[in-house]
Amino acid sequence: MAAETFLFTSESVNEGHPDKLCDQVSDAVLDACLAQDPDSKVACETCTKTNMVMVFGEITTKATVDYEKIVRDTCRDIGFISDDVGLDADHCKVLVNIEQQSPDIAQGVHGHFTKRPEEVGAGDQGIMFGYATDETPELMPLTHMLATKLGARLTEVRKNGTCAWLRPDGKTQVTIEYLNEGGAMVPVRVHTVLISTQHDETVTNDEIAADLKEHVIKPVIPGKYLDENTIFHLNPSGRFVIGGPHGDAGLTARKIIIDTYGGWGAHGGGAFSGKDPTKVDRSGAYIARQAAKSIIASGLARRCIVQISYAIGVPEPLSVFVDSYGTGKIPDREILKLVKENFDFRPGMITINLDLKKGGNRFIKTAAYGHFGRDDADFTWEVVKPLKFDKASA
């Protein structure tokens, strides 16, 4: 009897989606603050709608930051250079409403900058998850990796002129048929590919479909996963000329599943972009990913999830949890012991060990195409820590 398979789907959006535009602006502000003042405390939100971008939040920094310039530069880099494509970076309204971090939070978390790194408390309560799986070289879910890479490829062929009819906004979605092999996920085939991309007035739907298959899908999805039964929905609505902030309002923190694992594992609900590393929504999720990835890379399990939790002002996590979905070579309690011995989950130490005070153009790179599974030296949480265990007893 054939093994039973199931379908699972992940989606992504590319950098011209209004929510992702906002994530990128928020992280561009964070980068600018950290570049001048590594101790900046940043909680920067962004929203956008037709002809308007607003940044607001709480920022305490010694940096001199031109918020309006950051907004316009970020929108321009994405490709929003005229009203026709959804936003004109040089002529849109830019609103700024930034205040300082609450002194109540400041004294509880970092003692107004007097606490040593190991004493720095979590910036808030919350739960964070890290996930890893052996189904791809990146130790990430294949559905998520393919959906994300399709979005990145859409942007690449737009910017290099291969598909000149493309505009910045776009969404992707990939459904894969999986086999559950004792708790491990084994991709069998790609069942459905969905791409909805903004386009100009001149291109036909047939041209869109042909170009997407040739220049986007073919370079991204390995041929071994495609067959004559694979379903393609390419701009199924029939028309997507109006896009970006002109088509939909955008807001920071609305694409948290796209930022992480595409619906696999779990999510604690906290977003990443626009937050400095004292915000454990970000730093906690990063160290949890490093722990989960290290478990898989060290051969301790084929798939796993790590959860950590915090209280505001308290350095040590309240709890650490590991589940290997039955794929562990040793019991989960022993994997958990190794994790606790090898990873320091205190926010101040996460910041040092993952070098999270470095700005520049570091965090804006995370704000589109996922925070995990990226091959980039700035993604320090993707570096595997070898976890040694007694293979003889496994």
UniProtKB/Swiss-Prot annotation:
Annotated positions binding K(+): 45
Cofactor dependence: Mn(2+); Mg(2+); Co(2+); K(+)
Binding positions (ATP): 17, 169-171, 237-240, 248, 254-255, 271, 275, 279
Broad EC category: transferase
Gene3D superfamilies (alphabetical): 3.30.300.10
Record-linked CDD domains: S-AdoMet_synt (cd18079)
One GO CC term, this protein: cytoplasm
One BP term from GO: one-carbon metabolic process
Name of this protein: S-adenosylmethionine synthase 1
Organism: Hordeum vulgare (Barley)
